[in-house]
Amino acid sequence: MPRCLTHSARPRAGTARVSAERLIGFLGLCCLLLHCAGPSGTAWAARAAAGDPVSAALAKVGLTRETARVNRNDMNFFGGDRYRLSLFDALMDDPLRIPDLIPVLASSALSSSRSVGAATVFAGLRVKAGVRRGLIGDVVAGYEKRLKKPNCLLDAVEQLYEAASRADVVELDAGLPKLTAALPDSLAEPLALLVLAAAEGVKWQRLAFESIEDRDILFDEAIQYVSGLDSDKTDPGLTRRVEHAAGLVDYDYLNTGATDIAMVLDSVVVRLARLASSGAPWLKKLSFTCRTPLGDIIVNGTDPHVYRSALAPLLVVDLGGNDLYLAGGSTQSASNSISILIDVAGNDRYVCPASASRDTSGGSWEAAAGGIDREKPSFGGAVLGYAFLADLGGNDYYDGRNLSQGAAVLGVGVLCDESGDDRAKSFTASQGAGLFGLGIAINRSGNDQYHVYQQGQGYGYVKGCGLLIDGEGDDVYVANDTDIVFPSSQSKEHNTSLAQGVGFGKRADYVDGHSLAGGVGMLVDARGSDKYWCGVFGQGCSYWYGVGILADSSGNDEYNGVWYVQGSSAHFGVGVLHDALGDDHYRASINMAQGAGHDFSVGFLLDESGNDVYDAPNLSLGGGNANGIGVFWDRKGDDTYNVSAAMTLGRANIDAPRGGLRDRMLCLGLFLDTGGKDKYSKQFAGNGKTWTQPGPNESEPVPTERGVGLDR
């Protein structure tokens, strides 16, 4: 899918603000002391630089922290973009700040995952469409004040009808006042809060999409656009129409409505969990249904239930039992633009109708599957709207197809699983995938398994942010590389994964010139010994002005990939893998891995501590190619470096015919190991050594190829 035109490149938000203020104050104090101290201050600065391994290594090749970067003006000679993000600029302009910035960003993501509302705000901010609802005032309290007794749910539904105000809107059920009045306040109030938030969401959606002429057609074409991103058979006219429409959307308005619903959802799930745990006898056989312009409201008690695929609900609340879902929590049409599913307890199964016939449990759901379009979103998947799925407990099974399990195009899609040992399977654009929108997958605890083929597990396409945040547990992340259905341009024997922290853009400079800058993809795992597998493009990787981040906080982890993996980037991207604690094993089999940047890109692998093993290919461990910057830094531990190729351990190659502009532009490979007794397969590298390496074209060397390694 991504074409790389080269022949050789085979903490909490408040805490973050306080930390930033302290850092600024500290730097200001240092500058003041240096200014006042005169010559002795200069000497103090020199000694400080000598103690900095980064500065010490760079000095060996005539660089400083200030000059070791991709010059944006140089980059602009070759690349064009739209939707370029400020996060990309910040990291590209000063890549050696990555060890300071990325851990804070990952910590903020993890803190935000305690609240669906906070996570929605966090994701929006990454793509310059963040709306800080609740920064001043309490959003939920505002909705609570609007509850009108004695029949608050009826009033909320009436407000939703008014907000929808469509010519084809269904009429209010005649018996609804009696039905809603019969519900106790402990149930009616949380339902009413969500319906009120949905009514406001409709208004924000109308503002966001007011320049879109036909949302029904766009709904179907947006799904086809996503499904065809790795196909040469995609209709060019459809592509132009979807991308034109995406440029008309007001993403600030779009995310405003989603954020309100997310914040109300955080409050509602607490109330519903309290209600379910009360053990009230009437909960067991509870059953309530009513129509709304956006789909049905369905509420069931603690008995097991089956939710048929023909449903396109606005809201499903299930208070317990081992349930089977073939629908719910996903938008099914432009008119079903908001869908919320809350399951309070039970070992539940969420099975996309397209996946029902390949269920592996021995049962068959084909009879219930019906004729639902197999490409439509499912279970936290949104198109042109909002989808939320909250599962509060149990060992659950998720089986999707496309746009599932926290994914969105032109919308916001969220999956939040509170606890349990869960399994999630999907095909493409799932498990934290944002494309012209926000896709968020949160799993707070449990030993979980994630399986996808492509575009998932923290994937951000154009104007999109994809987040997969896992709180704790020994987890397994797989981007399938054995069943080859997306053969990569780099190696047909492997899939193009685009998974596990990937920011990805549309490169069209060699097609029609209409390139689009990539988004932000983040996979953040807090605790546990985890295993990661992917093919090509994954594990902290980016392409075409995207930002891809994989951050793992602790555990003895295993990383397995092929090409453009483990802190690498191609063509104007920033890719980072940050592992904080544990004895880890990194394996990459072919090329461009473990701190490698290609073509005005930055690739960075930072491992903070542990006795680690690196099985590295060519262009790795601090490999710069085609004016890219590759940085590798293992800070502590007794490490082992198994390498046989030449372009590794701090080496750079401009990889272009001599005499062009690229000869005058920096290409850097930087390797750092700053602690422990290490083992190297290369004789020139070793404990306590510093080394430099020339570019591979020794007959025509250029001074802008800088390669250096340092072991302390």
Model regions: which residues?
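Leucine-rich solenoid repeat scaffolds
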Residues: 670-712
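Extracellular beta-strand scaffolds
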Residues: 303-306, 313, 321-326, 331-332, ...
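N-terminal segments that cap or nucleate solenoid repeat domains
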Residues: 256-337, 347, 385, 390, ...
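Solenoidal tandem-repeat scaffolds enriched in leucines and small polar residues
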Residues: 404-413, 430-440, 449, 456-524, ...
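Terminal non-domain segments
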Residues: 2-4, 19-302
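Acidic/polar low-complexity surface segments
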Residues: 351-380, 431-432, 456-459, 478-514, ...
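Well-ordered beta-strand segments characteristic of repetitive beta-sheet solenoids
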Residues: 296-300, 313-319, 335-344, 362-366, ...
